[in-house]
């Protein structure tokens, strides 16, 4: 499970349809990471984790964004 409380979102990048999103975020210990989220139009409860997330820690937002773009097919840098 992803802990959404202990992070500062640096960027939230949505697809054109607004149904998928990648968050680039910094944790309390300074780690920069990314994870992918989705929402379903028939489910009003909001965003849900897809389970796709960074396998490494990045030094900055730009590095995390570039790494996410290599993994997430709809994401463009």
Q: PLM features: what roles do these ranges have?
A:
Residues 1-19:
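Negatively charged, low-complexity tracts enriched in Asp/Glu with abundant Ser/Thr
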Residues 21-48:
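A short, structured beta-strand/loop element
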Residues 1-2, 42-77:
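Mixed-charge, Lys/Arg-enriched low-complexity segments
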Residues 5, 17-18, 25, 37-38, ...:
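Intrinsically disordered, low-complexity regions of eukaryotic proteins
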Residues 6-11, 31, 51, 73:
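Intrinsic-disorder/low-complexity peptide segments enriched for small residues
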Residues 16-19, 30, 59, 64:
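A generic structural micro-environment signature
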């Amino acid at each position: 499970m992803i802990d959404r409380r202990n992070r500062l979102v640096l960027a939230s990048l949505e697809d054109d349809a607004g149904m998928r999103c990648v968050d680039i975020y910094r944790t309390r210990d300074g780690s920069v990471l990314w994870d992918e989220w989705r929402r379903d139009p028939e489910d009003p409860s909001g965003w849900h984790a897809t389970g796709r997330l960074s396998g490494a820690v990045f030094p900055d937002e730009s590095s995390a964004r570039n790494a996410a773009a290599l993994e997430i097919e709809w994401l463009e840098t």
